[in-house]
Every structure is written in structure tokens, then in C-alpha cells.
Amino acid sequence: MKFSTVILAAGKGTRMHSNMPKVLHTLAGKPMVKHVIDTCNNLGAQNIHLVYGHGGDQMQQALVNESVNWVLQAQQLGTGHAVDQASPHFQDDEKILVLYGDVPLISEDTIESLLEAQPTDGIALLTVVLEDPTGYGRIVRKRGPVVAIVEQKDASEEQKLIKEVNTGVLVATGRDLKRWLAGLNNNNAQGEYYLTDVIAAAHDEGRAVEAVHPSHSIEVEGVNDRIQLARLERAFQARQAKKLLEQGVMLRDPARFDLRGTLQCGSDVEIDVNVIIEGNVSIGNNVVIGAGSILKDCEIDDNTVIRPYSVIEGATVGENCTVGPFTRLRPGAELRDDAHVGNFVEMKNARLGEGSKANHLTYLGDAEIGKGVNVGAGVITCNYDGANKHKTVIGDDVFVGSDCQLVAPVTIGNGATIGAGTTLTKNVAEGELVITRAPERKIAGWQRPAKKK
């Protein structure tokens, strides 16, 4: 179904109390307006006309990778005026869908229903019935069909009793919408050009107006303050959690789970409370994610356990691994099958080989570590000389004792042993033992100082 979209995103968002344009505030880790853009792209919109005003530079910087037609609304003179700024780009025979950058949860199904419902040469309008319609434009019907929309400030007392309200979302043909927009005036209580007045214009021409309801009213709730944004955040997260539960993922507490990207899960995955998923995350079968962990743009293979409060970003974790608690895997970290990293271990751009372990208080950066290696507590790969990064290479079956500093570039051969407390600056051959310690001294007759009375 061919259509183009106008997204209204020019509002300042005064009640957000922020210097950032309202539509750039995030929901599930993504700007609200980006949710709307993604929905349109998923449905195959031919053109997306983004009407902006306040914070234009911020908007264009935040959405630099989006394929949209930027339309400036220099003065905010109402929704009708905003859509009219984009009207020179409308093709006469295409459907024009009007959406809002601060209404991020509208679904693809609802939009498809609206597009399909548009009468020939008429308008399809998205409406919703609210128990408390205060503040919304009322849908005025005459013996069934919609004949007009009356804004709250312009409504009579009788009209204020109407509970069916306008969401602002509509579809019309480009040719008709351009004509109706050109005929708008601002003779109303707010002195603005209302988009809603095109409904009356269509009715006056004898055009049909078809009302469609969303699957759930939360889809058409807008955001004007942080309270409303928080409400939509929880609604969105609840919806995502429900889908995961239906797919067989065990969320220990769905209300304490945040998905801020995409998650692909195998079978029998268990996710404990307060876990945050960001970016694109893939989890295999029989994986356990401990409480308070953060996973971003990473892959975790089958039968792996991520213990509580681990942070994994841009990393790959193999099968049968154990990570954490309190582990940080940074971009480029890779754990091969059966590897273990424990509490307060940090890895970046480093590979830990099959069956290797670094269980305590360790930094592994720019390192290649082979199979069956034991990395003791307090080991540091000294990879940075103040100007450049250097690599540490450790072969298979190496034992690195506690509190060692491996000053890169350095290579340790297979089966070597590095004694505790060693500062290593030279390569080590296969099977060698290397120890660099200060001589141990025993001071005869020494006594502790006595405390002053």
C-alpha cells in the first residue's frame, strides 16, 4: 500500500523542563520520534516528511542517519499550519498519513487498519473513547457519520460531554489534503490553524469520513511531561515483557525488566530482576542472566551463566561459560567455550581461550589468551604506553600467578609459568618459569612501635 507520512515534531515541550526538543527524549533507549520513523519504515512509507521547529540542529544531529525530508515550521501556528508546510511535497494521488513525534507507541496494525479504511476521496480518522476526555478535541457525529471535530476550548457544554475524541492521526489523499489545508483559518479560541478543521471541510464537500479505533488507547497517548513519558515507558516495557514470556523466556519479574533494543532468545532462558538489554542482543539456549546485569550489543551462547551485576557490551561469550558477578566485558572481548571470568574482571579487545579462567580482580586488554590458561588474582596486562596500545599473547596451558604485570608487547609460550608478583617485560619461551621479585629480607630483633599512653 503506497503512502507517505508527515510526522509533526516541531513542539518545544515546555513541560519537560529540558533544553532538548521533546521528541528526542527517549523511550526504551530510543528517541520518541525514532519509534514513529521506524514504524513508518517498517510499513514501507515512500516518503517521511519530518516537520521540525525548536532545536532544529539537535534534531538533525540526533537523526542524522534517518532518511527523512526535513520541513521547517519556523512559527508554531497550529497543527494545520504544520502539515501545510509539508504539503508542497505531497503527490496528488498518494495517501498522506499524519502522525506525531510525541505519540511513540502507535502500532503497525493500527496504521494498516487506518490506511485500509480510508474511503475513496475521503478521510480515515483515528479516534478513541476516553472516560475522561478533558483536553481533547471531541468527535461530532450526525446520525452516525463524523461531521466535525471541536477542540476543548471551542466546545459547547453539550459537546464537552462527548467521550469519543480525536487523536490527530488521519489519512487523506494528497490532492484533497492540500486543498483543505489551503482553506483553513485561525478564527478560534487559540488563534491557530487546526488540522482538525479539514474534517468539516471534507464533510461540506460530501466526502466520507471513516473513524477507526486503535487496538489499545495507550497507542495514541501523547507525551507532554516526564510523568506521561514514564507511564508510556512502563507500558512499552510491559508489552515487550509479555511477548518474551509468551515465547518461553522466564522473566523473574516482568515489571523489573527493561528491553531497550532487540533480543533474540533460545529456549529455557531465565532472566532475573533489574536486567537491562540494549542494542542487539542474542542469547542461546539454557542461559541464565543474573540480577542487575546490563547486556548491550552482545552474543551469549548456550548453557552460559551470567552472574549478577555483570556488564557486557560488544562482546561474544561462548558455550558453557561463567561470567561474574561484577564482571565487565567491553567491546571486542571474547570468551571461548568453557571459559570463566569472575568478580571484578575487566576485558577489552581480548580473547580468553577455551577452558581458561580469570576469576578475580584482573584487567585483560589487547590480549590473546590460549586454552587452559589460569590467570591469577590481580593480574594486569599493561597495554598502553601513554601513546599507543600494545598486545599481550599468552599460549596454551600457561599459569600466571597473582599480582603480575604483563608489560606489552610481550609473548608467553605454551606451558610457561609466571610466578606471583612478577613484572614481565620480556618474552617467555615454552615451559619456562619466570619470577621477578625483590629479595625477601628478615629483620632480626625488630619490634612494633609501642602506642603512646
From Swiss-Prot:
GO-annotated cellular components: cytoplasm; membrane
Positions in coiled-coil regions: none
Ligand binding (acetyl-CoA): 377, 383-384, 402, 420, 437
Family: In the N-terminal section; belongs to the N-acetylglucosamine-1-phosphate uridyltransferase family.
CDD domains in the record: GT2_GlmU_N_bac, LbH_GlmU_C
Keywords attached to this entry: Acyltransferase, Cell shape, Cell wall biogenesis/degradation, Cytoplasm, Magnesium, Metal-binding, Multifunctional enzyme, Nucleotidyltransferase, Peptidoglycan synthesis, Repeat, Transferase
A GO molecular-function annotation: UDP-N-acetylglucosamine diphosphorylase activity
Chemical reaction(s) catalysed: alpha-D-glucosamine 1-phosphate + acetyl-CoA = N-acetyl-alpha-D-glucosamine 1-phosphate + CoA + H(+); N-acetyl-alpha-D-glucosamine 1-phosphate + UTP + H(+) = UDP-N-acetyl-alpha-D-glucosamine + diphosphate
Name assigned to this protein: Bifunctional protein GlmU
UniProt-annotated catalytic positions: 360 (proton acceptor)
Cofactor(s), names only, from the UniProt record: Mg(2+)
Subunit: Homotrimer.
Superkingdom per UniProt: Bacteria
Role according to the record: Catalyzes the last two sequential reactions in the de novo biosynthetic pathway for UDP-N-acetylglucosamine (UDP-GlcNAc). The C-terminal domain catalyzes the transfer of acetyl group from acetyl coenzyme A to glucosamine-1-phosphate (GlcN-1-P) to produce N-acetylglucosamine-1-phosphate (GlcNAc-1-P), which is converted into UDP-GlcNAc by the transfer of uridine 5-monophosphate (from uridine 5-triphosphate), a reaction catalyzed by the N-terminal domain.
Chain spans, region Pyrophosphorylase: 1-226
Positions with a binding annotation for UDP-N-acetyl-alpha-D-glucosamine: 8-11, 22, 73, 78-79, 100-102, 137, 151, 166, 224, 330, 348, 363, 374
Species of provenance: Vibrio cholerae serotype O1 (strain ATCC 39541 / Classical Ogawa 395 / O395)
Swiss-Prot/TrEMBL GO biological process terms: cell morphogenesis; cell wall organization; lipid A biosynthetic process; peptidoglycan biosynthetic process; regulation of cell shape; UDP-N-acetylglucosamine biosynthetic process
Region (N-acetyltransferase) residue spans: 248-453
Keyword Ribosomal protein tagged: no
Location of the region described as Linker in the Swiss-Prot/TrEMBL record: 227-247
EC assignment: 2.7.7.23, 2.3.1.157
NCBIfam families: glmU, PRK09451.1
